[in-house]
C-alpha cells in the first residue's frame, strides 16, 4: 500500500529506479538496511517492517536462503526440500515439478533463514494475532494453480467445492456444464457432480495469451478474450449451457464470452460465478479498478445479467466462500 510513499523517500535521498515495480523499492530498502544490520536476514526483517501491504519475498546470498511473508498472510509462501537442497516458493506445485518434498508453509509475518550450518531458522517478530490474519481469497478462486496447496487447503478441492455450492444454491436446467479455462474448470466439474448435468469442454484456450482481467486497457482486454478463447461449436450447438467462471470484475469479457457461445449455437447461456460480486477494489496489489468501474457497483444481479446478455446469473454467497476456505481467515 505504501510503495509510492517509500519510493518518494528513496528518490529524495538519491535513489535512481530502473522500473516502476514495487519489488525494486523493497530491494533498495533491503540493500540500505544491510549497511546497518549484522546479517542479511536482519536487513530483510527491518526492510519488511517498513512495508504495508501484501508480499512474499525470497532473497538469496552466497550462504543463505531467506523468505519473508507479510504479517497478514495475504500471499502464499512455502518451503520444500530435494536431497540436501532447500527451496522457497510461492506455490507447492513448483515443488512437485522438480521432485521436491513439501516441508511446511512460511507463516504470516515470518522471516525464515536457511543455511548449511543452522538449517531452518524462524523469526516471528512481525507476526500478528491469528484473528488479524487475512489470506487473499483470490488465490483460491483465480491466481493459484489448481495443483497447489495453500496453508493446507487444496486449491483444486476448494474450487470443486465452490462449484458444488453453486449447483445447490443456483440450480438451473441445462444440457451442458462448462468452465471458462483455466480457473473455471474445477468449479464447473463440481457443479456437474452436484447437479448431474454432464460436464464438457466448450472452449479451446490459447496458452500464449496471459490473464485478461489485469490488462491495463479495455480494448486490450476485449481483444485478448477473442484471441485467448475459441468455442467448440460441436460441443454447444443446440444446447442449454451453464458457463462457470471464477469472477466478473468489469463485465466486458463476460459479455464477449456469452456472445461467443450464442454465436456457436448455444440456445441458452446461464452464467454461474464461483465468487461473490466484486463490490470494492483491492488495496493490496491486485489490479481491480476503482469502485465505479466494477460491474456490481450499484447494480442488482438481474441488471448485471442483462448487461452480459445471459439467460440467468448466479454468484457464490459470502458464507459459502468462507466454507470453501475451510476456516482460514480470509480477505474478501
What are these model-predicted stretches?
Residues 1, 6, 177, 184-191, ...:
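Extended, hydrophobic alpha-helical segments in both membrane/secreted and soluble proteins
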Residues 2-107, 113-174, 180, 268:
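Conserved short alpha-helical segments that host acidic/polar catalytic motifs at enzyme active sites
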Residues 15-18, 36-37, 169-175, 193-200, ...:
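Secondary-structure transition/capping motifs at alpha-helix termini
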Residues 19, 24-27, 199-210, 307-325:
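A conserved beta-strand->alpha-helix junction
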Residues 46, 94, 101-102, 106-110, ...:
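Phosphate/diphosphate-binding loops
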Residues 48, 63-64, 69, 99-105, ...:
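PRPP-dependent phosphoribosyltransferase catalytic core
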Residues 66, 74-75, 95-97, 120-122, ...:
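Flexible loop/turn segments at secondary-structure boundaries
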Residues 196-242, 252, 279-289:
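Short, glycine/charge-rich flexible loops or terminal/linker lids adjacent to PRPP-binding catalytic cores
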